[in-house]
Regions:
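Short catalytic/metal-binding and nucleic-acid-binding patches
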Residues: 1-178
């Protein structure tokens, strides 16, 4: 079966979901989940996209991202999945399939849509009985480990990539909170 074509718009914000290979609970291991989380934010710090929300569940991830003007959503997801696969293989000393091919996306339309998807991301571990409160789950945006980017329409920020004239003033945020 052919993978669906993604039709992404430069500067738009997306809710993205991707699953592990055969829905295996790879990210139940905190060290592996940390590798993925660090990969997401190192790609962000390199100016590839903005990260507004994320959650790393045992067998899938949800993110709200705004790709850079010269980075497609497909490329952003490829950077995260490909880089994390290599880093996980190195840490484990062996290669094994991490990711299911492809991903699903939903373009965020307005503030209400952004708020409802943010709430869904933050509450995902509570619904799965992995935490009692969103901020108790260590591999998600509600935990507060990483500085998040404001949603561009709400903040006036531009999509990243310094090659784009509108984003020249955008500076990468430090990944970890002081």
């Amino acid at each position: 079966m052919a993978r669906p074509e993604h039709r992404t718009r430069p500067g738009a914000t997306y809710f993205v979901t991707t699953n592990t290979w055969q829905r295996r609970p790879v990210f139940q291991n905190p060290e592996i989940a940390t590798i993925l989380e660090q990969r997401i934010f190192s790609c962000r710090d390199a100016g590839n996209f903005l990260v507004h929300r994320h959650i790393i569940m045992p067998d899938h991830i949800h993110m709200i991202l705004t790709p850079g003007m010269s980075t497609s959503l497909e490329k952003a997801v490829q950077l995260i999945k490909g880089g994390s696969s290599r880093q996980i293989a190195k840490a484990c000393g062996t290669r094994f399939p991490i990711w299911h091919q492809g991903f699903t996306e939903h373009q965020i339309r307005d503030q209400h849509d952004y708020d409802s998807h943010s709430k869904y991301v933050d509450e995902n571990p509570v619904k799965a009985h992995l935490a009692e409160l969103p901020h108790e789950f260590p591999h998600g945006s509600a935990f507060g480990k990483f500085v998040l980017d404001p949603w561009p329409p709400a903040s006036g920020a531009e999509a990243p990539n310094s090659s784009h004239p509108l984003s020249a003033g955008l500076k990468p945020r430090p990944s970890a909170r002081p």
